[in-house]
């Protein structure tokens, strides 16, 4: 009888943990079958990761979070932190400028363009980048 409460609480947490999804799973489920919005898949995941905000903005806090993940997962050496943040700031400015030029404001395409810009930097290797994002994705429950 003493352990009944503990067993029930443990069961509730176990059930909750089993039902938890990663951002990738959640976003893929959200956009499954919706070909018009499939371009928003990256934005959905990056929003859960904290790399881009709900309104497609890429501010200092989002850049800090993204750069920390890339350094923590070994994509970029920590000694190149300043260079990485500079690249990310430049990419953020570039995608905002492109959005204004194309007579649309920030949208899902902005997220994809930002991702591409950061990924094509000489500091980042695509294979390490993808693995780091996949590994980071597994650490988040939605």
Swiss-Prot record:
Annotated InterPro entries: PBP/GOBP (IPR006170), PBP_GOBP_sf (IPR036728)
GO biological process: suppression of blood coagulation in another organism
Location in or out of the cell: Secreted
Tissue specificity field: Female salivary gland (at protein level).
GO molecular function: molecular sequestering activity; odorant binding; toxin activity
A Pfam match: PBP_GOBP
Residues of the signal peptide: 1-20
A cellular-component GO term for this protein: extracellular region
Keywords attached to this entry: Blood coagulation cascade inhibiting toxin, Disulfide bond, Hemostasis impairing toxin, Secreted, Signal, Toxin
Highest taxon, organism lineage: Eukaryota
Cystine bridges: 27-44, 40-108, 91-117
Function: Inhibits contact coagulation pathway activation in the host by sequestering anionic polymers, such as polyphosphate and dextran sulfate, and thus blocking interaction of protein components of the pathway with negatively charged surfaces. Inhibits dextran sulfate-mediated autoactivation of host coagulation factor XII (F12). Inhibits dextran sulfate-mediated autoactivation of host factor XI (F11). Inhibits polyphosphate-mediated activation of host F11 by thrombin (F2). May inhibit dextran sulfate-mediated bradykinin generation in host plasma.
Family in the record: Belongs to the PBP/GOBP family.
Protein name (Swiss-Prot/TrEMBL): Salivary protein 15a
Organism: Phlebotomus duboscqi (Sandfly)
Taxonomy of the source species: Eukaryota, Metazoa, Ecdysozoa, Arthropoda, Hexapoda
């Amino acid at each position: 009888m003493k352990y009944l409460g503990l067993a029930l609480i443990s069961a509730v947490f176990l059930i909750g943990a089993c039902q938890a999804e990663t951002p990738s799973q959640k976003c893929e489920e959200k956009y499954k079958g919706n070909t018009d919005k499939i371009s928003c898949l990256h934005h959905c995941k990056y929003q859960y990761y904290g790399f881009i905000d709900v309104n497609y903005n890429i501010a200092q806090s989002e850049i800090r979070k993204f750069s920390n993940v890339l350094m923590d997962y070994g994509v970029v050496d920590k000694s190149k932190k300043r260079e990485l943040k500079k690249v990310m700031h430049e990419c953020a400015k570039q995608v905002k400028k492109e959005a204004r030029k194309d007579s649309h404001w920030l949208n899902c395409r902005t997220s994809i363009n930002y991702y591409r810009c950061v990924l094509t930097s000489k500091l980042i290797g695509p294979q390490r980048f993808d693995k780091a994002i996949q590994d980071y994705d597994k650490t988040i429950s939605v």
